[in-house]
From Swiss-Prot:
This is Thiamine-phosphate synthase. It is an enzyme of class 2 (transferase). InterPro entries: Aldolase_TIM (IPR013785), ThiamineP_synth_sf (IPR036206), ThiamineP_synth_TenI (IPR022998), ThiD2 (IPR041397), TMP_synthase (IPR034291), TMP_synthase_cyanobac_bac (IPR016229). Residues 1-129 are annotated as: Unknown. It comes from Nostoc sp. (strain PCC 7120 / SAG 25.82 / UTEX 2576). Its cofactor is Mg(2+). Its EC number is 2.5.1.3. One of its GO terms (cellular component) is cytoplasm. Residues 130-351 are annotated as: Thiamine-phosphate synthase. NCBIfam families: PRK02615.1 (NF002727), thiE (TIGR00693).
Length: 351
Protein backbone atom coordinates (compact mmCIF):
# COMPACT_ATOMS: atom_id res chain seq x y z
CA UNK A 1 0.00 0.00 0.00
CA UNK A 2 1.42 3.36 -1.08
CA UNK A 3 1.23 6.10 1.53
CA UNK A 4 -0.33 9.43 0.50
CA UNK A 5 2.14 12.15 -0.44
CA UNK A 6 1.34 14.23 2.65
CA UNK A 7 2.00 11.27 4.91
CA UNK A 8 5.27 10.52 3.12
CA UNK A 9 6.40 14.11 3.70
CA UNK A 10 5.46 13.86 7.35
CA UNK A 11 7.45 10.64 7.80
CA UNK A 12 10.35 12.19 5.90
CA UNK A 13 10.42 15.15 8.30
CA UNK A 14 10.44 12.79 11.28
CA UNK A 15 13.37 10.88 9.78
CA UNK A 16 15.20 14.15 9.11
CA UNK A 17 14.69 15.23 12.73
CA UNK A 18 16.04 11.90 13.97
CA UNK A 19 19.08 12.23 11.73
CA UNK A 20 19.69 15.84 12.74
CA UNK A 21 19.48 15.04 16.47
CA UNK A 22 21.83 12.08 16.23
CA UNK A 23 24.33 13.89 14.03
CA UNK A 24 24.48 16.57 16.71
CA UNK A 25 24.84 13.94 19.40
CA UNK A 26 27.68 12.15 17.62
CA UNK A 27 29.59 15.36 16.87
CA UNK A 28 29.21 16.68 20.41
CA UNK A 29 30.37 13.39 21.95
CA UNK A 30 33.39 13.23 19.67
CA UNK A 31 34.33 16.80 20.54
CA UNK A 32 34.24 16.03 24.27
CA UNK A 33 36.51 13.01 23.71
CA UNK A 34 38.78 15.04 21.43
CA UNK A 35 39.31 17.71 24.07
CA UNK A 36 40.60 15.14 26.56
CA UNK A 37 42.88 13.54 23.97
CA UNK A 38 44.29 16.97 23.14
CA UNK A 39 44.60 18.60 26.56
CA UNK A 40 44.49 15.66 28.98
CA UNK A 41 46.63 13.14 27.12
CA UNK A 42 48.58 15.52 24.86
CA UNK A 43 48.07 12.98 22.10
CA UNK A 44 47.98 14.51 18.65
CA UNK A 45 47.32 11.10 17.13
CA UNK A 46 44.19 10.39 19.19
CA UNK A 47 42.94 13.97 18.94
CA UNK A 48 43.47 13.80 15.17
CA UNK A 49 41.41 10.62 14.90
CA UNK A 50 38.58 12.29 16.85
CA UNK A 51 38.72 15.34 14.60
CA UNK A 52 38.69 13.20 11.46
CA UNK A 53 35.62 11.28 12.65
CA UNK A 54 33.88 14.48 13.71
CA UNK A 55 34.41 15.97 10.26
CA UNK A 56 33.26 12.76 8.57
CA UNK A 57 30.02 12.93 10.57
CA UNK A 58 29.62 16.60 9.63
CA UNK A 59 29.66 15.72 5.92
CA UNK A 60 26.18 14.21 6.36
CA UNK A 61 24.80 17.14 8.35
CA UNK A 62 23.14 18.87 5.41
CA UNK A 63 21.04 22.01 5.41
CA UNK A 64 17.83 20.09 4.76
CA UNK A 65 18.42 17.99 7.87
CA UNK A 66 19.17 21.07 9.96
CA UNK A 67 16.02 22.73 8.61
CA UNK A 68 13.90 19.91 10.04
CA UNK A 69 15.05 20.68 13.60
CA UNK A 70 12.28 21.48 16.08
CA UNK A 71 13.91 21.90 19.48
CA UNK A 72 10.87 23.58 21.04
CA UNK A 73 8.63 20.69 20.00
CA UNK A 74 11.03 17.92 21.03
CA UNK A 75 9.76 16.09 24.17
CA UNK A 76 13.21 14.54 24.62
CA UNK A 77 14.73 17.84 25.78
CA UNK A 78 12.95 17.44 29.12
CA UNK A 79 14.05 13.83 29.65
CA UNK A 80 17.03 13.14 31.90
CA UNK A 81 18.52 10.42 34.08
CA UNK A 82 20.36 10.83 37.41
CA UNK A 83 23.50 9.29 35.87
CA UNK A 84 23.61 12.16 33.36
CA UNK A 85 23.81 14.70 36.17
CA UNK A 86 27.21 13.61 37.45
CA UNK A 87 30.49 12.06 36.34
CA UNK A 88 32.59 10.30 38.97
CA UNK A 89 35.85 10.36 37.00
CA UNK A 90 37.44 11.13 33.64
CA UNK A 91 37.04 7.46 32.76
CA UNK A 92 33.30 7.63 33.47
CA UNK A 93 33.02 10.81 31.41
CA UNK A 94 34.84 9.25 28.45
CA UNK A 95 32.85 6.01 28.61
CA UNK A 96 29.57 7.92 28.72
CA UNK A 97 30.49 9.92 25.64
CA UNK A 98 31.78 6.91 23.73
CA UNK A 99 28.42 5.22 24.40
CA UNK A 100 26.69 8.40 23.24
CA UNK A 101 28.62 8.47 19.96
CA UNK A 102 28.26 4.74 19.30
CA UNK A 103 24.52 4.75 19.92
CA UNK A 104 24.07 7.83 17.74
CA UNK A 105 26.01 6.24 14.88
CA UNK A 106 23.91 3.08 15.15
CA UNK A 107 20.74 5.19 14.82
CA UNK A 108 22.28 7.07 11.88
CA UNK A 109 23.23 3.78 10.26
CA UNK A 110 19.61 2.59 10.24
CA UNK A 111 17.66 5.79 9.57
CA UNK A 112 20.35 7.00 7.19
CA UNK A 113 19.37 4.24 4.78
CA UNK A 114 16.09 6.10 4.29
CA UNK A 115 17.93 9.32 3.47
CA UNK A 116 20.86 8.35 1.24
CA UNK A 117 21.96 4.95 -0.11
CA UNK A 118 25.54 5.45 1.15
CA UNK A 119 24.82 6.98 4.55
CA UNK A 120 24.08 3.72 6.37
CA UNK A 121 27.33 2.08 5.28
CA UNK A 122 29.36 5.21 6.02
CA UNK A 123 27.99 5.43 9.57
CA UNK A 124 28.59 1.72 10.11
CA UNK A 125 32.26 2.14 9.18
CA UNK A 126 32.56 5.17 11.47
CA UNK A 127 31.00 3.22 14.33
CA UNK A 128 33.66 0.52 14.06
CA UNK A 129 36.37 3.19 13.98
CA UNK A 130 34.93 4.65 17.18
CA UNK A 131 35.09 1.19 18.81
CA UNK A 132 38.79 1.02 17.89
CA UNK A 133 39.34 4.58 19.11
CA UNK A 134 37.77 3.71 22.46
CA UNK A 135 40.04 0.70 22.88
CA UNK A 136 43.15 2.70 21.95
CA UNK A 137 42.24 5.68 24.10
CA UNK A 138 41.44 3.70 27.24
CA UNK A 139 44.67 1.74 26.83
CA UNK A 140 46.63 4.97 26.31
CA UNK A 141 44.98 6.47 29.39
CA UNK A 142 45.96 3.49 31.52
CA UNK A 143 49.55 3.53 30.31
CA UNK A 144 49.89 7.24 31.01
CA UNK A 145 48.59 6.85 34.55
CA UNK A 146 50.85 3.83 35.07
CA UNK A 147 53.88 5.90 34.09
CA UNK A 148 52.83 8.73 36.39
CA UNK A 149 52.27 6.39 39.34
CA UNK A 150 55.09 6.35 41.89
CA UNK A 151 53.50 4.32 44.68
CA UNK A 152 51.80 0.95 44.20
CA UNK A 153 49.80 -0.63 47.02
CA UNK A 154 49.46 -4.42 46.99
CA UNK A 155 46.75 -5.45 49.43
CA UNK A 156 46.79 -8.24 51.98
CA UNK A 157 43.70 -9.76 53.67
CA UNK A 158 42.36 -7.40 56.31
CA UNK A 159 39.08 -6.69 58.05
CA UNK A 160 39.72 -3.01 57.35
CA UNK A 161 40.61 -3.55 53.69
CA UNK A 162 38.21 -1.02 52.17
CA UNK A 163 38.81 1.79 54.71
CA UNK A 164 42.58 1.31 54.46
CA UNK A 165 42.52 1.44 50.67
CA UNK A 166 40.32 4.54 50.67
CA UNK A 167 42.62 6.23 53.16
CA UNK A 168 45.58 5.54 50.84
CA UNK A 169 43.63 6.86 47.86
CA UNK A 170 42.91 10.04 49.81
CA UNK A 171 46.65 10.34 50.32
CA UNK A 172 47.28 10.31 46.58
CA UNK A 173 47.64 6.62 45.71
CA UNK A 174 47.01 6.02 41.99
CA UNK A 175 47.74 2.29 41.62
CA UNK A 176 46.28 -0.62 43.61
CA UNK A 177 46.63 -4.38 43.29
CA UNK A 178 44.09 -6.64 44.95
CA UNK A 179 45.97 -9.71 46.18
CA UNK A 180 44.18 -12.44 48.12
CA UNK A 181 45.23 -16.07 47.74
CA UNK A 182 42.89 -17.67 50.27
CA UNK A 183 39.40 -16.12 50.15
CA UNK A 184 36.70 -18.00 48.25
CA UNK A 185 35.70 -16.68 44.84
CA UNK A 186 32.30 -15.34 45.90
CA UNK A 187 33.83 -13.03 48.51
CA UNK A 188 36.77 -12.21 46.25
CA UNK A 189 34.43 -11.13 43.45
CA UNK A 190 32.44 -8.93 45.82
CA UNK A 191 35.54 -7.28 47.28
CA UNK A 192 37.16 -6.83 43.87
CA UNK A 193 34.04 -5.09 42.57
CA UNK A 194 33.98 -2.71 45.53
CA UNK A 195 37.70 -1.99 45.23
CA UNK A 196 37.44 -1.31 41.51
CA UNK A 197 34.59 1.12 42.09
CA UNK A 198 36.55 2.81 44.86
CA UNK A 199 39.73 3.12 42.80
CA UNK A 200 37.94 4.48 39.76
CA UNK A 201 36.05 7.02 41.86
CA UNK A 202 39.47 8.43 42.83
CA UNK A 203 40.88 8.14 39.31
CA UNK A 204 43.26 5.31 40.30
CA UNK A 205 44.17 2.13 38.43
CA UNK A 206 42.92 -1.20 39.76
CA UNK A 207 44.91 -4.39 39.14
CA UNK A 208 44.02 -7.98 40.04
CA UNK A 209 46.70 -10.39 41.23
CA UNK A 210 47.01 -13.59 39.16
CA UNK A 211 43.37 -14.03 38.14
CA UNK A 212 42.68 -12.99 34.55
CA UNK A 213 39.09 -14.25 34.83
CA UNK A 214 38.45 -12.08 37.88
CA UNK A 215 40.04 -9.07 36.19
CA UNK A 216 37.64 -9.46 33.27
CA UNK A 217 34.65 -10.10 35.53
CA UNK A 218 35.07 -6.83 37.44
CA UNK A 219 36.43 -4.73 34.54
CA UNK A 220 39.82 -4.22 36.22
CA UNK A 221 42.52 -2.17 34.52
CA UNK A 222 44.82 -5.15 34.33
CA UNK A 223 46.38 -8.16 35.98
CA UNK A 224 49.66 -8.88 37.76
CA UNK A 225 51.26 -12.26 37.09
CA UNK A 226 53.85 -14.16 39.10
CA UNK A 227 56.60 -16.28 37.59
CA UNK A 228 54.48 -19.43 37.92
CA UNK A 229 51.34 -17.89 36.40
CA UNK A 230 50.15 -18.10 32.79
CA UNK A 231 52.30 -16.76 29.93
CA UNK A 232 51.92 -13.06 29.19
CA UNK A 233 50.90 -13.85 25.60
CA UNK A 234 47.98 -15.97 26.83
CA UNK A 235 46.87 -13.27 29.25
CA UNK A 236 47.10 -10.70 26.46
CA UNK A 237 44.84 -12.78 24.21
CA UNK A 238 42.23 -12.85 26.95
CA UNK A 239 42.57 -9.27 28.18
CA UNK A 240 43.15 -7.49 24.88
CA UNK A 241 45.65 -4.71 24.17
CA UNK A 242 43.99 -2.03 26.29
CA UNK A 243 44.54 -3.62 29.73
CA UNK A 244 47.80 -3.66 31.68
CA UNK A 245 49.83 -6.77 32.42
CA UNK A 246 52.56 -6.82 35.05
CA UNK A 247 55.05 -9.55 35.91
CA UNK A 248 57.04 -10.23 39.09
CA UNK A 249 60.79 -10.63 38.55
CA UNK A 250 63.62 -11.54 40.91
CA UNK A 251 66.68 -11.34 38.67
CA UNK A 252 68.01 -9.95 35.40
CA UNK A 253 67.02 -12.98 33.30
CA UNK A 254 63.42 -12.88 34.51
CA UNK A 255 63.30 -9.13 33.90
CA UNK A 256 64.54 -9.37 30.31
CA UNK A 257 62.18 -12.27 29.58
CA UNK A 258 59.16 -10.40 30.97
CA UNK A 259 59.96 -7.33 28.87
CA UNK A 260 60.49 -9.43 25.74
CA UNK A 261 57.14 -11.16 26.31
CA UNK A 262 55.33 -7.81 26.43
CA UNK A 263 54.88 -6.95 30.10
CA UNK A 264 53.61 -3.39 30.53
CA UNK A 265 55.47 -3.10 33.83
CA UNK A 266 57.48 -5.33 36.15
CA UNK A 267 57.98 -5.84 39.86
CA UNK A 268 61.63 -5.84 40.97
CA UNK A 269 62.38 -7.71 44.17
CA UNK A 270 62.01 -8.71 46.86
CA UNK A 271 64.42 -5.94 47.78
CA UNK A 272 64.37 -7.05 51.41
CA UNK A 273 63.16 -10.27 52.98
CA UNK A 274 59.41 -10.13 53.54
CA UNK A 275 56.75 -12.46 55.01
CA UNK A 276 54.63 -12.03 51.87
CA UNK A 277 57.33 -14.02 49.99
CA UNK A 278 58.15 -16.76 52.49
CA UNK A 279 61.29 -18.73 51.65
CA UNK A 280 62.36 -16.35 48.89
CA UNK A 281 65.77 -14.76 49.31
CA UNK A 282 66.01 -11.02 48.95
CA UNK A 283 67.16 -9.84 45.52
CA UNK A 284 68.75 -6.84 47.21
CA UNK A 285 69.53 -3.29 46.20
CA UNK A 286 71.90 -4.56 43.51
CA UNK A 287 68.95 -5.78 41.45
CA UNK A 288 67.26 -2.39 41.94
CA UNK A 289 70.34 -0.70 40.47
CA UNK A 290 70.38 -3.17 37.57
CA UNK A 291 66.72 -2.47 36.79
CA UNK A 292 67.37 1.27 36.89
CA UNK A 293 69.97 0.87 34.16
CA UNK A 294 68.37 -1.79 31.99
CA UNK A 295 64.56 -1.82 32.23
CA UNK A 296 62.76 -0.33 29.22
CA UNK A 297 59.33 -0.49 30.89
CA UNK A 298 58.06 1.05 34.14
CA UNK A 299 59.16 -0.98 37.15
CA UNK A 300 58.40 -1.00 40.85
CA UNK A 301 60.84 -2.02 43.55
CA UNK A 302 58.98 -4.27 45.99
CA UNK A 303 59.60 -6.31 49.10
CA UNK A 304 59.95 -5.02 52.66
CA UNK A 305 60.00 -1.36 51.66
CA UNK A 306 58.74 1.13 54.23
CA UNK A 307 59.21 4.69 55.45
CA UNK A 308 62.49 3.76 57.16
CA UNK A 309 64.28 2.36 54.12
CA UNK A 310 62.58 3.96 51.12
CA UNK A 311 65.38 6.47 50.64
CA UNK A 312 67.95 3.65 50.42
CA UNK A 313 65.84 2.13 47.65
CA UNK A 314 65.58 5.51 45.92
CA UNK A 315 69.35 5.99 46.19
CA UNK A 316 69.80 2.60 44.49
CA UNK A 317 67.87 3.94 41.48
CA UNK A 318 64.18 3.28 42.15
CA UNK A 319 61.66 5.84 40.93
CA UNK A 320 58.62 3.72 41.84
CA UNK A 321 57.98 1.38 44.74
CA UNK A 322 55.29 -1.12 45.69
CA UNK A 323 54.39 -1.72 49.32
CA UNK A 324 52.20 -4.08 51.31
CA UNK A 325 52.64 -4.03 55.10
CA UNK A 326 53.82 -0.43 55.40
CA UNK A 327 50.37 0.72 54.29
CA UNK A 328 48.07 -2.21 55.07
CA UNK A 329 49.26 -2.22 58.70
CA UNK A 330 49.66 1.54 59.08
CA UNK A 331 47.73 3.34 61.79
CA UNK A 332 47.40 6.38 59.51
CA UNK A 333 47.48 5.12 55.89
CA UNK A 334 46.76 8.56 54.43
CA UNK A 335 49.78 10.16 56.11
CA UNK A 336 52.08 7.24 55.27
CA UNK A 337 50.94 7.37 51.64
CA UNK A 338 51.63 11.09 51.48
CA UNK A 339 55.08 10.64 53.00
CA UNK A 340 56.11 7.83 50.66
CA UNK A 341 54.89 9.75 47.61
CA UNK A 342 56.67 12.91 48.79
CA UNK A 343 59.96 11.01 48.92
CA UNK A 344 59.42 9.52 45.47
CA UNK A 345 58.43 12.88 44.03
CA UNK A 346 61.84 14.27 44.90
CA UNK A 347 63.01 12.33 41.87
CA UNK A 348 62.66 14.08 38.52
CA UNK A 349 59.41 12.77 36.96
CA UNK A 350 59.67 10.67 33.82
CA UNK A 351 58.99 12.75 30.70
Amino acid sequence: MVEPYSQQKQIQQVVYRILDANLDRAREGLRIIEEWCRFGLNSGQLAGECKYLRQEVAVWHTEELRAARDTAGDPGTDLSHPQEEQRSSIKALLQANFCRVEEALRVLEEYGKLYHPKMGQACKQMRYRVYSLETNLMGHQRHQLLRRSRLYLVTSPSESLLPTVEAALKGGLTLLQYRDKDTDDFVRLELATKLRQLCHSYGALFIINDRVDLALAVDADGVHLGQQDMPIATARQLLGPQRLIGRSTTNADEMQKAIAEGADYIGVGPVYETPTKIGKAAAGLGYVSYAAQHSSVPWFAIGGIDANNINDVIDAGAERVAVVRSLMQAEQPTLVTQYLISQLNRIKPES
